[in-house]
Amino acid sequence: MTRSLKKNPFVANRLLRKIDNLNTKAEKEIIITWSRASTIIPTMIGHTIAIHNGKEHLPIYITDRMVGHKLGEFAPTLNFRGHAKSDNRSRR
């Protein structure tokens, strides 16, 4: 179910404050965040945001095509290593 259009997109206040401060200073630095549920808004374009995947922070460069998506979509949490191999040979 999508978010109501009457509401604004969710962005964590702390993350929004950090981005606004960097935009007023015209600086670029990596912003570390745990807020995977935050929506990418146009003021974030051009910044690098390190998104937590449960183990480490993955730096993601925000482009204009990412606007409207959530930060968590770009930091995968699961690492599938393949199904276990069958050990039928060793059992014989």
Curated annotation (Swiss-Prot):
Localization terms from the record: Plastid, Chloroplast
GO CC terms, sorted: chloroplast; mitochondrial small ribosomal subunit
Top-level taxon in the UniProt lineage: Eukaryota
InterPro entries per record: Ribosomal_uS19, Ribosomal_uS19_bac-type, Ribosomal_uS19_CS, Ribosomal_uS19_SF
Entry keyword annotation includes Aminoacyl-tRNA synthetase: no
GO MF term list: rRNA binding; structural constituent of ribosome
A Pfam family of this chain: Ribosomal_S19
Keywords in alphabetical order: Chloroplast, Plastid, Ribonucleoprotein, Ribosomal protein, RNA-binding, rRNA-binding
KW Ribosomal protein (keyword) present: yes
Gene3D superfamilies according to UniProt: 30s Ribosomal Protein S19, Chain A
Alphabetical GO biological process terms: ribosomal small subunit assembly; translation
Function field: Protein S19 forms a complex with S13 that binds strongly to the 16S ribosomal RNA.
Family note: Belongs to the universal ribosomal protein uS19 family.
Protein name listed in UniProt: Small ribosomal subunit protein uS19c
Species of the source: Daucus carota (Wild carrot)
Gene, per the UniProt record: rps19
